[in-house]
Regions:
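Patatin-like phospholipase
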Residues: 1-39, 47-431
Length: 431
């Protein structure tokens, strides 16, 4: 990016590790940050960016625990919905029982790692937000506007996630989390006149100030994955979120392609050329009539397919290469990790290796297809079933009416099977 670049980091509590992954990608691209603003955990991460201490930031998050934030370790498996609900319930109960949780351990963590003088003299404009309590008035400051010894206090104020955490008081004023007045402080960054903004949104609750600066482009980086409960601080989950932030940033900067999964640039470019042609050919094969019946079914299947593609990928990928969006549906159906980077070959090899391990059925011998589908909960099996139908019909040049039923009832599996079918000419040894 040319000119002065601003980095804006939203609030989001335990999800903040994601922003460190974005920082990793920025460093790899040698994007120099001139302005960084943040709210709550975004202010804490922003201070580390201004301090230029990437390794410290990684280490803090890679070793994070709830006890280091609030002297309390709720129990629950962070990688399951049930476990996250247990943690959420435990934190809420503690906040109610104690009339807000004491965040003194967080202050110790900040004091241990942040160097106010270094931040202020870094040459990077570092800004943060907070809100007065109980009046809820915005506090929007840059580090060079306050005394260095007050920076830790203001960062604690910005991070006082009320009503879970207690309001933070100093110099006769009480403060709460900056998200109450400016969750993602783009307007604060714009006050320093950057040429471009990179905004990292953790999708946490908070007030958003409207931004009206069409002349300053904003690159948004946000996750389609679940980054976890706001007050869940776990080292293993944080490391996963760092990876998510890194890969999402790489896609946002155009280094990788994909909406949720990451593929090397140029992947499936040749497949893209025949994607539309094969789709049209299949629709014509299965619904050749020009009457209202076939036309209605065609439109319904297209709507279903588009809905799935936009859910499992994104609009940008759909527009540039729908074959990649289709690959992402297949990746989801076959439970591929979104934390890996795939080449066209590695993805194709992995997909057909998985496909070869699955059982096969002859669709002609299936009586009630709807009842059959209800007994199968594994979408991978359905994907292989549809793939097999497409291959058989191509060889015999026939029209199997059950294929259209399968496509309508299981659109995710249909698209995954269709993607395998697109790749089939390259899989000469696959049976």
């Amino acid at each position: 990016m040319k000119g002065k670049t601003g980095l804006v980091l939203s609030g989001g509590g335990g999800r903040g590790a994601y922003q460190i992954g974005v920082w990793q990608a920025l460093r790899e691209k040698d994007i120099q940050i001139s302005v960084v603003t943040g709210t709550s955990v975004g202010a804490l991460n922003g201070a580390l960016v201004a301090q230029g201490d990437y390794e410290t930031a990684v280490n803090i998050w890679a070793e994070i625990t709830s006890k280091k934030i609030m002297n309390f370790e709720p129990k629950g498996d962070v990688f399951t919905k049930k476990g996250q609900l247990q943690i959420t319930k435990a934190v809420a109960q503690k906040a109610i029982r104690e009339k807000c949780i004491d965040q003194t351990p967080l202050k110790k963590l900040i004091e241990t790692h942040l160097l106010p003088e270094r931040i202020i003299s870094s040459g990077i404009d570092f800004g943060f937000t907070a809100a007065t309590y109980p009046t809820i008035r915005p506090v929007r400051l840059f580090a060079d506007e306050i005394a260095p010894e007050k920076l830790v206090d203001y960062l604690m104020a910005s991070s006082a996630c009320f009503p879970f955490f207690k309001p933070y008081s100093f110099d006769g004023t009480s403060y709460i989390d900056g998200g109450y007045t400016d969750y993602i402080p783009i307007s604060l960054a714009l006050s320093k006149k950057p040429n471009a903004i990179i905004a990292v949104d953790l999708k946490a609750p908070g007030f958003r100030r409207p931004v009206f600066r069409a002349d300053v482009p904003v690159t948004w980086i946000e996750s389609k994955s679940d980054l976890g409960f706001l007050l869940m601080f776990d080292a293993d989950y944080a490391r996963v979120n760092i990876r998510r932030g890194y890969l999402d940033a790489k896609r946002a900067f155009g280094d990788h392609i994909g909406g949720i999964y990451s593929f090397e640039k140029g992947s499936f470019s040749e497949l893209h050329q025949k994607f539309q042609r094969v789709i049209q050919s299949l629709l014509q094969q299965y619904f050749p009539g020009k009457g209202m019946g076939d036309e209605a079914v065609r439109k319904r299947l297209i709507r279903l397919a588009l809905r799935v593609l936009l859910t499992k990928s994104d609009k940008k990928t759909m527009e540039h290469n729908p074959a990649v969006a289709c690959a992402e549906v297949a990746a989801s159906v076959f439970h591929f990790s979104p934390l890996d980077v795939y080449t066209e070959k590695s993805f194709t090899d992995k997909l057909f290796a998985e496909l070869s391990l699955l059982p096969s059925w002859d669709i002609e011998k299936i009586g009630d297809l709807s009842a059959f589908l209800q007994n199968i909960t594994d979408e991978r099996i359905l994907a292989k079933l549809f793939y097999s139908v497409l291959c058989q019909d191509q060889v015999s040049n026939r029209r199997n009416s059950k294929a259209s039923v399968l496509a309508a009832l299981a659109p995710d599996a249909f698209l995954a099977g269709f993607f395998c079918f697109l790749l089939r000419p390259e899989q000469k040894n696959f049976q």
